[in-house]
Amino acid sequence: MGIMESIDIGANALKTHGLRIDIHAKNIANIDTPNYVRRIPVLNATEDISFRVVLNQMKNDVYGTGTLPYTQGGVVFTGVVEDPTLGERIYRPGHPDADANGYIRSSNVNAMVDMADAIMAQRAYEANLALVYISKSMAAKAVEIGR
């Protein structure tokens, strides 16, 4: 894997985890909004490769530890799904969002779950930002050595 590939992977991860942070922030912001349905980010691997395919492609000589001739590229943000759990029914007959029986649904957002998910996404974002900075400094050193 080259330096530029690591920067590309880091940039892709920054975009992905930034979107995760945005989704969790919107969930937390709408925790008191009636009928709001929690959104869940969906991430998938960029390549779906089976173990056997990877094993067959490994370069494994007598003295080596085994390496792959390519990088898979990490994960990609593929969309958002709505949490199917229902919020609590609350009787509010005059509320504009009330149904025919006078009930509204509270949001199904759990603040602790979304805060924990947002913190994990933030830490992943920070780790990938460090990857980009380190790759950038490695590229600068390589150019400096080449002079």
Describe each region flagged by the PLM.
Residues 1-147:
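Amphipathic alpha-helical polymerization modules
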